[in-house]
């Protein structure tokens, strides 16, 4: 071989090696290797740094120490704690602030000296069907200052609830470094099939080789144990189901008590009643919600509104007026709703409210996880609902993975001239996972929203915030996820409306993860207020 030819061959050989290395690094960065060896602790770059993200979104005065709770009497006890009014007269006028001091005590009757507990407050009158949430300030020393607003005449009561102690919150974070739930993936080729564990974080799935199915999940991180059968490949993944997993979680008995029914969501005793006089309505001169800069909706302090006679009344703007006005406003438009079963409730409530008819596949189950579409021919309007991508809890039955596409993928497909309204929501299906998973997804959605607004500046976009509930312990993460959404959508606040739904459920102290349909209707009407 001549020296010239040898030199050219070496250069070509070096070029091929560099090309392969670059391609491997690039693909690894974008999607990770198809098979990841957990035994050798090789993760995608996204997973290596994800263990501490999310903590920055915790409230002020909150820390996450390494120690675990072993003494069941050390946390705050609602029944041992107390609350009292700053103004002992208990008489207020419409619009005045009602201030309450809350002092927490532990199971030994000793005053708490640290903060970090999840304390919520509301004002209510069941006879008037009037309810409003309040704003709670953590003083960092075991005491909390709650501020409510006098919004209706008559006598009302104050309810202060210790939803989660700081020790419970620390435990909830710690077990999400493991996993409190798994998606099971089915791999199938011909008559051979196998079920394996799946998770959005590779570090959770230890002990076996993994299939990196991020690309198949629309670019959202997704991993499953590689099937043991040599007849099954990673691309044979077809279906998913869900399994809860409390086995092996690193919880002490004291922590288990805090995360079990009866260990959270307990009202602090106190017969605190106030009376409000003066029927003047100080909120009469507020603008129409449709004329309000959407940036305001991202920075509102509770309460943003209140229920009166079970009708929601926003405070900073005039809300829903009448159905005819809404129908006129929606004429020729399409509403696209993304999310979970709570936005599916929105879709369900809108069908009779707007007199639409379902034109997609009839729902054979109440837990419907396929896209749905309805038409309102009488005023040229259509609406669609799409479930989120994985992680998505489809329940105990098997569902095809092809129906679970990322919101960002749908947003990228919306045309430049479509007359469209978009509602985006993520929440409950992410509670079982470390907050990093939500953070990754919401950033991707925000990027796609930016692209959409550049392409179609006339599109109307809503971000439906989280809600609160008492039916299980995970609702603490509502504030963390809302903070993440706020951060991810920075620079878009004046173009996207944030719907602070937790004020609706805090006001009513909603128990179930699915709010009652009478409240869902009020949420939908509130959204419409910003359209017309």
Regions found by a protein language model. Give the residues of each.
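A compositional signature for long Ser/Thr(±Pro)-rich, low-complexity
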Residues: 2-139, 145, 149-532
């Amino acid at each position: 071989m001549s020296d010239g030819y040898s030199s050219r061959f070496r250069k070509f050989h070096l070029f091929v090696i560099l090309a392969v290395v670059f391609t491997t690094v690039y693909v690894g960065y974008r999607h990770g290797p198809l098979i990841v060896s957990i035994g050798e602790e090789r993760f995608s770059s996204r997973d290596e740094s994800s263990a501490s993200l999310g903590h920055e979104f915790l409230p002020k005065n909150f820390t996450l120490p390494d120690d675990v709770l072993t003494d069941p009497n050390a946390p705050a006890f609602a029944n041992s704690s107390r609350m009292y009014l700053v103004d002992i007269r208990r008489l207020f006028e419409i619009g005045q602030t009602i201030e309450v001091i809350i002092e927490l005590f532990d199971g030994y009757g000793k005053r708490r000296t640290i903060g970090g507990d999840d304390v919520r407050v509301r004002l209510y009158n069941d006879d008037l069907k009037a309810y409003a949430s309040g704003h709670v300030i953590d003083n960092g020393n075991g005491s909390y200052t709650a501020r409510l607003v006098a919004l209706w005449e008559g006598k009302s009561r104050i309810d202060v609830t210790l939803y989660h102690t700081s020790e419970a919150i620390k435990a909830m974070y710690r077990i999400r470094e493991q996993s409190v739930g798994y998606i099971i993936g089915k791999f199938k080729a011909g008559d051979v099939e196998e079920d394996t564990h799946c998770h959005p974080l590779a570090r959770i799935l230890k002990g076996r080789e993994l299939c990196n199915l991020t690309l198949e999940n629309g670019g959202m991180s997704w991993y499953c144990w590689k099937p043991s059968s040599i007849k099954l490949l990673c691309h044979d993944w077809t279906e998913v189901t869900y399994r809860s997993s409390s086995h092996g979680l690193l919880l002490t008995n004291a922590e288990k008590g805090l995360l079990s029914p009866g260990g959270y969501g307990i009202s602090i005793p106190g017969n605190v009643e106030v009376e409000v006089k003066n029927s003047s309505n100080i909120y009469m001169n507020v603008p129409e919600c449709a004329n309000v800069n959407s940036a305001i909706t991202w920075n509102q302090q509770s309460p943003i509104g209140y229920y009166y006679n079970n009708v929601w009344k926003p405070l900073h703007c005039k809300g829903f007026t009448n159905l005819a006005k809404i129908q006129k406003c929606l004429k020729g438009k399409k509403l696209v709703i993304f999310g979970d079963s709570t936005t599916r409730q929105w879709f369900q409530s809108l069908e009779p409210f707007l007199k639409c008819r379902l034109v997609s596949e009839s729902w054979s189950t109440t837990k419907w996880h396929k896209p749905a579409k309805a038409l309102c021919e009488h005023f040229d309007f259509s609406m669609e609902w799409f479930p989120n991508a994985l992680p998505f809890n489809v329940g105990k039955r098997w569902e095809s993975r092809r129906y679970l596409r990322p919101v960002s993928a749908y947003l990228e497909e919306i045309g430049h001239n479509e007359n469209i309204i978009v509602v985006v929501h993520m929440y409950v299906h992410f509670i079982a996972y470390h907050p990093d998973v939500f953070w990754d997804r919401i950033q991707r959605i925000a990027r796609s929203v930016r692209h959409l607004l550049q392409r179609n500046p006339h599109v109307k976009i809503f971000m439906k915030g989280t809600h609160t509930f008492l039916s299980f312990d995970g609702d603490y993460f509502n504030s963390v996820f809302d903070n993440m959404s706020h951060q991810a959508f920075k620079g878009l606040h004046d173009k996207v409306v944030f719907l602070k739904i937790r004020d609706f459920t805090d006001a009513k102290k909603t128990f179930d993860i699915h709010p009652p349909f009478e409240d869902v209707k009020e949420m939908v009407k509130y959204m419409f207020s910003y359209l017309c």
